[in-house]
Amino acid sequence: MVTKAKIPLFLFLSALFLALVCSSLALETEDLSNELNPHHDPESHRWEFQQCQERCQHEERGQRQAQQCQRRCEEQLREREREREREEIVDPREPRKQYEQCRETCEKQDPRQQPQCERRCERQFQEQQERERRERRRGRDDDDKENPRDPREQYRQCEEHCRRQGQGQRQQQQCQSRCEERFEEEQRRQEERERRRGRDNDDEENPRDPREQYRQCQEHCRRQGQGQRQQQQCQSRCEERLEEEQRKQEERERRRGRDEDDQNPRDPEQRYEQCQQQCERQRRGQEQQLCRRRCEQQRQQEERERQRGRDRQDPQQQYHRCQRRCQTQEQSPERQRQCQQRCERQYKEQQGREWGPDQASPRRESRGREEEQQRHNPYYFHSQGLRSRHESGEGEVKYLERFTERTELLRGIENYRVVILEANPNTFVLPYHKDAESVIVVTRGRATLTFVSQERRESFNLEYGDVIRVPAGATEYVINQDSNERLEMVKLLQPVNNPGQFREYYAAGAQSTESYLRVFSNDILVAALNTPRDRLERFFDQQEQREGVIIRASQEKLRALSQHAMSAGQRPWGRRSSGGPISLKSQRSSYSNQFGQFFEACPEEHRQLQEMDVLVNYAEIKRGAMMVPHYNSKATVVVYVVEGTGRFEMACPHDVSSQSYEYKGRREQEEEESSTGQFQKVTARLARGDIFVIPAGHPIAITASQNENLRLVGFGINGKNNQRNFLAGQNNIINQLEREAKELSFNMPREEIEEIFERQVESYFVPMERQSRRGQGRDHPLASILDFAGFF
């Protein structure tokens, strides 16, 4: 009987223990329900869920009970999330009241967790306010049309809110991204409102400068402090907006009838006044000063053209511009050909209007033929065709178009570019490096060039006629310490990345050029330079106050930069040295007499030129003289006119008419197979700043005008072991032929042939008057030589 009584007692005690456990769990569930506030944001719910799970692990001893506790935590989390969503959709409460309740909840928590909890409350409050503002804006489109808010001000406030939160870097970037998205959305809405309100008319009167918008957009991208990929995406959006704004501005200008002004130019003084007024209306600060300088330069250029007889628009230049537009705007070869034919018709029609049907004369016809030949000359580049890359009041950097943009005949040198630097006295060119090898010639003034690599820094004083090579990737900077003379440097570049394409990377920026350091995110720069962010911002902002990459400097600083530089003839020490500059004037004269002189630096003699395989030469032809017909065996020479005027004539085996500017594939093969040995005379008048190309094997003669000497600088591509063969003068190659070879070749008695080729007593350079003294029935002194060019 006693044993049977113990069993009910055990069952009673077990039931009592289970009841106590269930009661305890119910209380815990109620506490959890109170702690998981449905009005917290998702991050708060997740944090509290983690706290709940930790309590389950610490307070529940059995594994099964701990799992049950964790499942209850998960159910509570899901329920609170559903309640929060229902309240946001159906019955949202006043944000201020929610914020106060959230703060009260934070005060009940662990003091160590209170700051983080309060920041979450603050963020939730701001987001709810923003949602309400968006809802109000949806119902106030009409009001917004009348009084739109400035998106930039909204963006500034959003950024300030992100900074006040004091979150980690990742949360900061996410917040910045949301600000960016809102900013873009507001901008699109504002543009739509402006279009609906017809603000295009106002924009025609006071248009915003697209370049200023682009600069602000870039500055905004830099302030974000995002990663490199996000920075690039932001920069791409800025470029797209710039292109769109420029198209809109061009459309506005066309509607204002500016095309008529371009076709019928008014008085230059009126154009100058209009240019100045436009600067006053559209520019501010330093950009306004730059705009005024451009107006002044334009007026001076027009004055020079009037003095040279170019007060009316040159049909030839219009034709070249039309041809370039065809090549850049039309994609298919067929459409390019049709476009070029339209250019041809317009050119002929304009010539007919200028000359008139009854005004033909032998002199005008001769001039017309000469202009026609020059217009179809793919080897000649007018100085006005150079494109400006960096321009300021202190100087300019110009570059020639890619050689294959004009014609496929120059494919052999398509990986070379020509760049010209012009700098005023007492100026400094900001440091930069480029992805191209370069050979530089000083064609005016004096300079100090410094380039820096990882191992060393080298500085050289350069004078007129000095040549120096700068390796790809070396950071270089130039000064013009002369107080009176302008500096001019001509460069031949060989890009190392993409054929025919090069880029300049400036270490220090300006208004028109960005420093490559600015593209890096703030955290990268702060860590790499060990400098606070605010100092870096001042560092970059200070640079952008400058107008361009060529700036004025004090004489004291310029002297300090040049005092340790070496000059031509001094050999720098070190195996990795560049080798220093070469003085063309100090080279042994290759050809010289009283009518001209020719100096040349070859890669066989100068290791500085060996890697690029380029020769550099300087020629001075006295006025009224000629460099006799000759050709180069291997080198294709790019010639720059340093000073003077003149002309050249060249024998060319290709059809250089406008219909034959494109030499591709089968057409080239057909031309080679059907070649009849006929040559065309390619000619052009030369003036300072012009560029022309002499392909290897092409006989050419160059003459100086009767008024001034002609000075030329040439870069010979594939210059190693090049030979220059003269076709006239005492040292011509015809005199070296055997007697029988002369008679068989020219079908004349040997005596008559020798009388022709040995008649000239001078070599290399000859006077034009002496060539035509006896007169042999030729219209031009070069005719007797160039007629033979077809044989060679």
From Swiss-Prot:
**UniProt domain Cupin type-1: residue ranges:** 384-537, 582-754
Q: Tell me the segments the record calls region Disordered.
A: 132-153, 182-217, 240-272, 302-325, 350-394
Spans of biased composition, class Basic and acidic residues?
182-200, 207-217, 302-314, 350-375
| Any one Gene Ontology BP term | seed maturation
Biased-composition ranges, Low complexity, are: 315-325
Positions of the site: Cleavage? 311-312
Instruction: Extract the signal peptide range.
Output: 1-26
* Keyword check for Oxidoreductase: no
Q: Which residues bind Cu cation?
A: 379, 652, 654, 698
Q: Which InterPro entries match?
A: Cupin_1, RmlC-like_jellyroll, RmlC_Cupin_sf, Seed_Storage-Functional, Vicilin_N
Query: Which CDD domains does the annotation name?
Result: cupin_7S_vicilin-like_C (cd02245), cupin_7S_vicilin-like_N (cd02244)
Q: Which GO terms describe its molecular function?
A: copper ion binding; nutrient reservoir activity
Q: Which residues form a coiled coil?
A: 727-754
- Alphabetized UniProt keyword annotations: Allergen, Coiled coil, Copper, Metal-binding, Seed storage protein, Signal, Storage protein
**Tissues in which the UniProt entry reports expression:** Expressed in seed (at protein level). Expressed in seed.
Q: What family does this chain come from, according to its entry?
A: Belongs to the 7S seed storage protein family.
Q: What does this protein do?
A: Seed storage protein.
- Subunit field text: Homotrimer.
Q: What's the protein here called?
A: Vicilin Car i 2.0101
* Provenance organism: Carya illinoinensis
